[in-house]
Amino acid sequence: MCSIGEDDFGDEGGTHAMLPSCSETGIVLRAGDCSKCGQSSQQLYKLNFRSAECSECFLKYVRHKFRAALGAAKVLPRNAEILLVIDGSSESLVLLDMVHFAQTQNTFKRLHCNARVLYVDAHCSPIKEEESPLLALNELQRRYEPFEFYVIQLNGDPQSLQLLKDYTVRQLDSILDQFNSSTSRQDYMQQKRKFLVGGVAMKLKCSHVFEPSISPSLATQLLTSVALGRGASVALDVALLDDRLMGDVKLLRPLKDLNDQEVQFYVHAKELKAFRVDDPSHYPLSGGSLQSLTRDFVANLQLNYASTVSTVFRTGDKIAPKRNSKEIMASYCALCQSLLDNNISDTLLAIEYSRAVSEVGVELKMKSSCDVLEQRVLERLNEKEELCHACRNIQAELSSGTLI
């Protein structure tokens, strides 16, 4: 452990301790010369650890990070069929714009792939027509021709996929309101969305899926996954390539090296307008969810310590379970597609025993309490064998119905 400054916390309050960064960055609203190309610009962009630059130089820099993520790993074959998932967030619009730009370049610089766009409708309450995502989606389709846009509801199946021009907004009849906690609801929405996207990709014969995750969201995802009991799959949750989708579909995160500042600057430079209406924070009591609290925790640290997000999410590359040849016949979770660990640990036994005590409660009789508890623990461990520990926790928070 680092011990710098440990002995310096006296009356001066830690004079030699690490201090938060306070560098001034942001869009400079004045004319000036770009530090890269030397051209005069009406608006300069100042990123952390970079000199002020014009919009053209800034866009080249950010787009290079996108292309470098795909090129360095060589994970996207030539002329691949890709499914680009958008949710109306700023980062999803940035990804859409980058893919479209990469496909409109000359032959040498062109990204050789065929892209389709998917929007997953997860809003489960009536909304005003002017607040409907269809207006923004239709505008995007006109702007980013010739991409085909598809829409599907979160509670649907891949066969219910519709083209944007044929889609009509209707109230969702889902189980989102049946969860006892907002943490489980958000976790279910995330896993269900990924499961649905994999099915849609198979239907459209797409071999790869582009997900608009950036470094802050991946850092939050890493910490959240560990807290929710998904530690065995946390490396895939934050990696560039996630191969857990059905049908050998590969999920890619080409924006994983971008941060919030770069995304917001890109949105400003390209005059993009976010329209996300299915954010989990719109649901009641979502502010107290584990995901929301973790996101706020990471964001607050990032404000003062610029390397927080990078340090956290890059740790995920080093966290992976041991693999062996027996995994050829391994089974996978029916919802999140993660590898099932059939070895019962003492921790899981203790958790299920505690839940059994809570469920049986005062109905226990002293003479049969041990037998009843042991029987209940065995029943719980054998229930939902097709689900992993984290997804069984989601099922336990569901007041009625089943996840699959």
From Swiss-Prot:
It comes from the Eukaryota. Pathway: tRNA modification; 5-methoxycarbonylmethyl-2-thiouridine-tRNA biosynthesis. The keyword tRNA processing applies. Keywords: Cytoplasm, tRNA processing. It is found in: Cytoplasm. GO terms for biological process: protein urmylation; tRNA thio-modification; tRNA wobble position uridine thiolation; tRNA wobble uridine modification. One of its GO terms (molecular function) is tRNA binding. One of its GO terms (cellular component) is cytosol. InterPro entries: CTU2, Rossmann-like_a/b/a_fold. Belongs to the CTU2/NCS2 family. Plays a central role in 2-thiolation of mcm(5)S(2)U at tRNA wobble positions of tRNA(Lys), tRNA(Glu) and tRNA(Gln). May act by forming a heterodimer with NCS6/CTU1 that ligates sulfur from thiocarboxylated URM1 onto the uridine of tRNAs at wobble position. This is Cytoplasmic tRNA 2-thiolation protein 2.
